[in-house]
Design a protein with these regions (language model features):
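Conserved "HGTGT" condensation-loop signature of ketosynthase/thiolase-family condensing enzymes
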Residues: 1-126
Length: 126
């Protein structure tokens, strides 16, 4: 069975840009997103470099109350999905919500945090 998939919007939170526009501009300019690790003390580790997301503000990109319950990687995914949805310019009041979806990709996330937060949501609700 063949099914059509239509990409209608794009969103990005990356080490070289926190929006699609910033990302593409950085890619065209050949910017590198790898640099010294700043999120934690690396003195006990051999690896000192990473591709960290910089300058991201959850307050500016989503409901902050919801963001406080998320790990940073989830905040990045939600912000990128929100940007993609806005980029699509679809009026969902005119669409069947069961025929729409968002594909989210993340290089890695905290599985422990996913488990912990899943349990919290089950117990307390979203």
């Amino acid at each position: 069975m063949k099914r059509r998939v239509v990409v209608t919007g794009l969103g990005a939170v990356t080490p070289v840009g926190n929006t699609v526009e910033e990302f593409w501009s950085s890619v065209r300019e050949g910017k590198v997103g790898i640099g010294p690790i700043t999120k934690f003390d690396t003195s006990e580790y051999k690896v000192k470099l990473a591709a960290e997301v910089k300058g991201f503000s959850a307050k500016e990109r989503m409901d902050f109350k919801a963001a406080k319950r998320m790990e940073p990687f989830a905040q990045y995914a939600v912000a990128a999905a929100k940007e993609a949805f806005e980029d699509a310019k679809i009026d969902m009041s005119q669409e069947n919500p069961y025929r729409a979806g968002v594909i989210v990709g993340s290089g890695i996330g905290s599985l422990q945090a996913v488990e912990t937060n899943y349990e919290k949501i089950l117990q307390k609700g979203p």
